[in-house]
């Protein structure tokens, strides 16, 4: 019922928008899984930087094995979205290292490109990545998962738009976004990845877009959908915490 309500709200939020959208959201504890064109491919832009860091951690053996220089580059790449730092770490990991991580993570839909920002993602694969970062598993150590999420929690204020839109107080937010005017400057690729944890909930959301006439247009498209997701989950959790009495949110 929650997924059906959410799907309807997302469809309403998208009505009249020019953007193409791929969306995936899951809260395993609530049994929630919801998607919209989650298998469609979108140009990554800086959303790929979470995968670059994750692949680096797999290659080096974990967060405890990173050099001071690698840590400095990782912080700049995630918290400030430094392209120069991404260039350096992409070169260190290499296409082979990136593909090994994708294979281990089960991210079989992701299409690597020699230019990291032109790698093609799907919302379903990005949700797989976010689930990997927030759940125990064999791919990344607990310290590595915590390291990535800590950096995502420290993204600078001007880059914390997108999936956190409308999030309630007391919810921990980890976010990484991407934006690219490609190929003509009239088609912005705007993407947002987020994980959220609060009382009674821990969920992940990936929203990828293309066909945006401006950056703000794409951000607004993502945030309209994200507000639906964040509102619906908050209301459902509040209903559960009240004992599930009264009318279920609908």
Where would I find each of the regions flagged by the language model?
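A short glycine/serine-rich beta->alpha loop
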Residues: 36-42, 112-116
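Hydrophobic/aromatic-rich structural module bridging two neighboring secondary-structure elements via a short loop
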Residues: 70-75, 82-91
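Acidic/His-rich structured neighborhood in mature extracellular/periplasmic domains
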Residues: 45, 68, 107
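Short alpha-helical patches at coil-to-helix transitions and adjacent helical residues
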Residues: 47-50, 79, 83, 123-127
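Short, well-structured active-site flanking segments
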Residues: 58-76, 98, 144
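Active-site SXXK
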Residues: 31, 41-65, 77, 205
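Penicillin-recognizing serine hydrolase domain
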Residues: 1-21, 26-30, 89-250
């Amino acid at each position: 019922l929650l997924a059906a309500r959410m799907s309807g709200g997302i469809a309403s939020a998208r009505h009249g928008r020019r953007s193409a959208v791929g969306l995936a959201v899951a809260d395993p504890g609530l049994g929630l899984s919801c998607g919209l064109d989650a298998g469609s491919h979108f140009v990554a832009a800086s959303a790929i930087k979470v995968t670059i860091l994750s692949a680096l951690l797999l290659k080096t053996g974990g967060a405890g094995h990173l050099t001071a220089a690698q840590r400095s580059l990782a912080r700049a790449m995630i918290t400030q979205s430094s392209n120069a730092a991404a260039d350096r770490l992409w070169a260190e990991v290499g296409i082979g290292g990136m593909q090994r991580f994708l294979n281990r993570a089960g991210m079989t839909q992701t299409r690597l490109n020699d230019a990291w920002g032109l790698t093609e993602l799907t919302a379903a694969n990005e949700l797989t990545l976010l689930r990997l970062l927030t759940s125990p598993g064999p791919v990344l150590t607990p310290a590595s998962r915590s390291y990535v999420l800590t950096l995502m929690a420290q993204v600078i204020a001007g880059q914390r738009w997108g999936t956190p839109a409308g999030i309630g107080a007391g919810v921990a937010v980890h976010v990484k976004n991407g934006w690219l005017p490609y190929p003509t400057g009239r088609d912005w690729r705007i993407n947002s990845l987020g994980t959220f944890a609060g009382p009674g909930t821990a969920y992940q959301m990936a929203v990828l877009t293309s066909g945006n006439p401006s950056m703000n247009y794409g951000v607004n498209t993502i945030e309209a959908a994200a507000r639906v997701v964040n509102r619906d989950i908050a209301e459902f959790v509040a209903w559960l915490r009240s004992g599930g009495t009264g009318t279920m949110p609908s």
